[in-house]
């Protein structure tokens, strides 16, 4: 083992598709590399890898999961690439995100080439846990350390396989949200709402679009990303010129839109284990209206650093948006508190905690190997002298 700690970060989701887990994998990897840890990300990619430290494992297949469509790669070719990468790289530690999701993370557990740290992100329920409980439970014994990103995520995995879990909330690369130039509203005084999330039922975009009908005519809405409901929603609301359909944004453009918006809205209905999008808005200095979900309450407190409303309530959402769009004093109070709250979710702080776990697991493994070598030497010395002489007699001569 060299002096430089080598970590294999394995993600089951395609890095070519925006998503919360993918963002955490890449952000955490960047911070760890900046700290001098050699991290290589193993993940599916449906295009060029997003960074030089990414090993692409093949293309993904859209798969239904947790009320969403996940870009997974459970095919045999992806698993063969995973096996090859794990074998050739000889990582000191393997860090799996969503370890029991079909694809490379499951393969990495079966390979078990190094101590494994596992981070669980999902909340709510999981078909993988329900239908694969026995093999998942057996495989869980190979996990050296378990992390859940929220209490909800811990509750889900503990319900099926038990065990001890450390709760480490997700992180945000704070400097990026404070240094990017803001993209101005259509006109400087135009009240503007920003939505950024997959266009599917659980994200609540339907509710926000319906609420727009109750807001003043001057209010503008930026709708980023896309999804299975995009065509239907655009057909239904496309005539409203106040709604701007932006499509998928780069990280830089997303941050600029956050900083340029008056209010960020996260109207999700369910299935949110942790509110990273809220931390991003807080870090960017943008006021927030969001659904009062457990995952979002991990981050935000109503009337302290955000306004939280009942999920799916169009009237309540419209009322909260109108109030925050036009109350400058309230917005300033919430954004100031939000920026302070975001400090608790620094990606650098999260990376330092994980780095300490990597070093501990590496040291534990080295100690076990040393004890094993000593025990082997002791057993050899205790063997009869005649047996040792036979070993020497039949030992192959060196070539």
Map each language-model feature to its residues:
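N-terminal strand-loop element at the rim of the active site
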Residues: 4-5, 11-18, 25-77, 84-85, ...
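Membrane-proximal helix-turn-helix segments that form the acceptor-binding/catalytic region
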Residues: 124-146, 153, 159-160
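Carbohydrate-associated surface elements
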Residues: 152, 171
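Nucleotide-activated donor-binding/catalytic signature segment of Leloir-type glycosyltransferases, i.e.
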Residues: 231-253
